[in-house]
Amino acid sequence: MEKLTILLLVAAVLMSTQAMFQGDGEKSRKAEINFSETRKLARNKQKRCGGYSTYCEVDSECCSDNCVRSYCTLFG
């Protein structure tokens, strides 16, 4: 009977330890997903602009802020 009690206590400790480590793993995975989503949102919020020789109508559409004859230029 005494051996059974000790065995049950050891099993309970092992199970609680396993549950504790699994819980931390889920939290870190969620944090990783949240970090990934934050990067995507930041990237989407960045100014969208046309590179060299991209069609444009106004200066602000070009990364260089130079729209000449409907195309982005490197220099004004």
Swiss-Prot record:
It is found in: Secreted. Residues 1-19 form the signal peptide. GO terms for molecular function: ion channel inhibitor activity; toxin activity. It comes from the Eukaryota. Disulfide bonds join C49-C63, C56-C67, C62-C72. Keywords: Amidation, Cleavage on pair of basic residues, Disulfide bond, Gamma-carboxyglutamic acid, Ion channel impairing toxin, Knottin, Neurotoxin, Secreted, Signal, Toxin. Residues 20-46 form a propeptide. The modification 4-carboxyglutamate is found at E57, E61. Transmembrane segments: none annotated. The presence of a 'disulfide through disulfide knot' structurally defines this protein as a knottin. Gamma-conotoxins may act on voltage-gated non-specific cation pacemaker channels (HCN). Potent neurotoxin. This is Gamma-conotoxin-like TxVIIA. The lineage of its organism: Eukaryota, Metazoa, Spiralia, Lophotrochozoa, Mollusca.
